[in-house]
Amino acid sequence: MNRRDFVRNSSLVSGGLLYINPAFASDENLKNNYTFNLKYAPHFGMFNNMAGNDSMDQLRFIYDQGFRAFEDNGMKGRKIELQEKISSFLNKNNMDMGVFVAHTIYWNEPNLASGNMNKRKQFLSEIKESVEVAKRLNAKWMTVVPGHLDLRQDIGYQTLNVIETLKLASDILEPHNLVMVLEPLNFRDHPGLFLTKSSQAYEICKAVDSPSCKILYDIYHQQIEEGNLMPNIENCWNEIAYFQIGDNPGRNEPTTGEINYKNIFKYIHKKGYNGILGMEHGNSKPNREGELAVIKAYKTVDNFLN
């Protein structure tokens, strides 16, 4: 499942009144009896077989499993009334809001890399809009993907175009203490994109030189793109503000692929990371069985202190 699928699927969840769904209310195994060592953030649609399709019921279910963060790529497109309900629930339950996608992503044509002034203006306008969404949700981070390569320009000029635009976006975000996190995406799922490697994101963040421009290190994407995960995380550490998770192959929950998430989480925890790790992946199995498998997997890989 790729990012476009996540963005599209997240838009299908609608709001409603909060109640405990009978599908899970009586299951003693699903009560809030586990405290995670890190802030893993599920998304809408991950537990809809057990929690139901109502977004507020899903949030309650997420909380009841012990998760204390939540992310939603499609939050910006949701009705303000629902955003306010979500914000109220998160605040009352001491949960953190994770990333949402801040702008239109150009998957098939260049925008930020091109230096086109109209596309730059569009991007900055959408960043301004996202400030209001972040305020409403008490969110700190928003995802930025610089879009497609401009194959008619040298990579050096493209990089400069991206840096100049991100500096302007940082000027918008800094007064509000908000952070755009740049997400490198892998070549296999998203061929032709400008930003692919952690070192490239690190270089850009250093050039922008703003507390409002940091890295979203997606462990799934970087396993495919470059591997060598922990050394690369170490090299980029002081510019990483957010992590996302997914095993490879398959982009499903930890323990279903080749990545040793227990060791990675132990390393991240030892480094003192207290931010969010977004669960931006699918479920390896369908229905209730698959949702229980996700919960079990996170309890397994989170058990790294013993």
Give short role names for the model-derived ranges:
Residues N2-Y63, L195-Y217, H221-N306:
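Histidine-acidic metal/acid-base catalytic patches
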Residues S10-Y19, L30-Y34, N93, L112-K214:
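Active-site acidic/histidine proton-transfer and metal-coordination neighborhood
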Residues M46-N48, G74-K76, H103-Y106, H148-D150, ...:
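Active-site-proximal loop/turn and secondary-structure-junction residues that shape catalytic pockets
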Residues M56-M75, N138:
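Catalytic domains of carbohydrate-active enzymes, especially glycoside hydrolases
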Residues E71-N91, P146-D150:
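Glycine-rich, proline-tolerant flexible connector loops at the mouths of alpha/beta enzymes
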Residues I80-I86, I155, N287-G290:
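Metal-dependent catalytic neighborhoods of phosphoester/phosphodiester hydrolases
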